Amino acid sequence: MIRSGAGTEQLARQLSVAVVEDNPHIRQLLQDEIHDEGHRMIGFSSAEDFLATYGEESIDLILLDLMLPGMDGLSCLQQLKINQSQDGCPRVVIVTALDDAEKRRIALDNGAEEYNLKPDLFLRLPDLLQSETTATEEARRHP
């Protein structure tokens, strides 16, 4: 687990990325991409599993599917924002197959920073991880 100020410069650049995705194939593809970029992925197949362990590990970025069994991604996002600590919630990026303007608006209004369609996410992921790495390093240097 990587915490603020811990480890070497190389470790400081490694992100912990939570992926909340019920499709095991997509979760594995994301894990491969995240690992290839030098980061760590923690996978969850449901919003309930994610929320039950949220806060136990340091997480820098959350990739959250909208269509999940049980609690959906929007409800999970709302719960995250309600329960966030004073330090704030990590950046949340919605990952979905739903190209739905209303869902996009609701997600962004509820604190998601981005709304990505799944096919596009794989093209966007390296840049997304790099920008988050830069932001995380800056936050660690200037707490």
Residue spans for each PLM region:
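Non-catalytic signal-transmission and effector/linker regions of two-component phosphorelay proteins
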Residues: 1-18, 24, 123-143
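Two-component/phosphorelay signaling modules centered on CheY-like receiver
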Residues: 24-42
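Residue-level signal for the "D+5" position in two-component response regulator receiver
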Residues: 43, 68-71, 109
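Acidic, metal-coordinating helix/loop segments flanking the phosphotransfer/catalytic sites
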Residues: 43-61
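Acidic catalytic/metal-coordinating carboxylates
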Residues: 46, 72-78
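His-Asp phosphorelay/catalytic-motif detector in bacterial-type signaling
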Residues: 58-60, 85-91
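Active-site residues of response regulator receiver
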Residues: 65, 96
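Alpha4 helix (beta4-alpha4-beta5 surface) of REC/receiver domains from two-component response regulators
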Residues: 75, 99-116
